[in-house]
């Protein structure tokens, strides 16, 4: 059983010495919210690394997240007053960027500034999805990280989900090897809406559900269609058709609900899409045209978050639904209790027959992706996904927005993509009227 962080400190193994001897990686988090905490949960299955730092613009939230890491026994984490201070600490070898989209460029600027002024050294940076709010910002993030000469990784958890990885590996090894490559992949992420106000605000987040969640699905379908061991570049996006809508949250009663529960969100004036779909035509290096279908929603009301993926080929198929988790609980109407998310993320009910995702950090891929990038930054593996891949995801998303706005299929990449900003992000999008 591995000694906990406090035990290591009592016996003289400081975070600094652990980090500098090359055997362990000291990791600092930018961001203290929901996403950072999922990573920390996943860290219980990560070897050779400790969560040692947290920075957030809200110092109380940073301290709370650091305390949470200590309670999980994944590192002797502490809160830092600035990103520069965290980078300057010799205990910190790598940064995980998990904060809000609107702060992405600023956060990376602070990291690189500290490095270039000689305040500290890092082995790598891992950045959450989406890489940025638009192509121009994504390119700036990539430029900054490359200017610092750092190894980099793009955090897309669903690519590392065990069901996705196992299904992909088996279908390619058994089905594709004997009857031909797969030709259609589908992926979806659906729930009833985000936790915090900035997600709902197009100007801050960079869009609505397409930007927030289709970033998962467009990479999952491409990953499934790519032969294991081959780079993503062997399956290239060529044409994109997309659609966006506000199906639920522009209805008057739900506009009022958002205004009441999400501070500063007014969908009567500045709505975002709560549903999006796309069809992506890919060309493969072996001469085939293959398809990826994606959909995503903040207007899905079921037991909770539902992730799904499919891969189809000439004589085989796979299907995954995260709510088919095996464990189910039933509570009669006599069972009373507070609302929560103890059964599944974005949980919508506490009675009836409910699925339980017993270890969400594993099921959604957080544990495996964190383990992978730790090993990358320790020189033991090559990154499966880099910020270059994150940039291409943003390019696909912006093309999807442009396709939806123009109502037509677009070649990828369309001209002028670097300067494109979705109407949702500019606050000028008007969805079809919902209700009387």
Where would I find each of the regions flagged by the language model?
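Alpha-helix termini
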Residues: 16-19, 69-74, 112-124, 173-178, ...
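Beta-loop-alpha module in the N-terminal Rossmann-like domain of NAD(P)-dependent dehydrogenases
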Residues: 18, 75-146, 163
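Short, well-ordered coil/turn residues at beta-beta hairpins
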Residues: 98, 295-296, 310-313
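Rossmann-like dinucleotide-binding domain that binds NAD(P)(H)
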Residues: 197-304, 388-392
């Amino acid at each position: 059983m591995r000694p906990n962080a406090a035990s290591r400190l009592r016996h003289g193994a400081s975070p600094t010495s652990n980090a500098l001897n090359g055997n362990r990686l000291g990791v600092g988090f930018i961001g203290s919210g929901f996403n950072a905490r999922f990573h920390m949960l996943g860290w219980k299955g990560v070897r050779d690394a400790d969560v040692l730092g947290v920075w957030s613009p809200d110092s109380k939230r940073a301290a709370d997240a650091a305390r949470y890491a200590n309670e999980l026994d994944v590192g002797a984490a502490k809160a830092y007053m600035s990103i520069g201070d965290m980078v300057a600490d010799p205990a910190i070898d790598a940064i995980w960027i998990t904060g809000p989209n609107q702060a992405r460029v600023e956060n990376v600027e602070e990291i690189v500034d500290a490095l270039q002024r000689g305040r500290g050294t890092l082995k790598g940076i891992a950045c959450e999805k989406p890489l940025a709010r638009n192509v121009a910002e994504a390119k700036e993030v990539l430029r900054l990280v490359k200017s610092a000469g750092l190894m980099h990784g793009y955090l897309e958890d669903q690519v590392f989900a065990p069901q996705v990885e196992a299904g992909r590996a088996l279908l390619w090894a058994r089905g594709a090897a004997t009857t031909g490559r797969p030709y259609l992949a589908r992926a979806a992420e659906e729930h009833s809406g985000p936790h915090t106000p900035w997600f709902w605000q197009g100007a801050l987040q960079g869009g609505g559900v397409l930007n927030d969640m289709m970033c998962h699905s467009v990479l999952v379908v491409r990953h499934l269609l790519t032969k294991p061991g081959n780079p993503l570049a062997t399956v290239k996006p060529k044409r994109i058709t997309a659609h966006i809508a506000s199906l639920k949250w522009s209805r008057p009663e739900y506009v009022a609900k958002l205004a009441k529960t999400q501070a500063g969100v007014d969908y009567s004036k500045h709505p975002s899409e709560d549903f999006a779909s796309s069809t992506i035509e890919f060309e493969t290096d072996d001469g085939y045209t293959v398809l990826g279908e994606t959909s995503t929603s903040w207007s899905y009301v079921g037991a909770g978050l539902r992730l799904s993926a499919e891969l189809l080929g000439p004589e085989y198929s796979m299907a995954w639904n995260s709510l088919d988790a095996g464990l189910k609980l039933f509570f009669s109407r006599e069972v009373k209790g507070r609302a929560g998310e103890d059964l599944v993320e974005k949980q919508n009910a506490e009675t009836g027959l409910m699925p339980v995702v017993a270890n969400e950090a594993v099921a959604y891929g957080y544990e495996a992706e964190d383990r992978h990038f730790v090993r990358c930054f320790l020189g033991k593996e090559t990154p499966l996904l880099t910020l270059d891949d994150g940039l291409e995801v943003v390019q696909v998303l912006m093309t999807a927005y442009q396709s939806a706005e123009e109502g037509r299929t677009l070649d990828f990449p369309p001209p002028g993509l670097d300067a494109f900003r979705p109407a949702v992000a500019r606050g000028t999008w008007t969805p079809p009227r919902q209700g009387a």
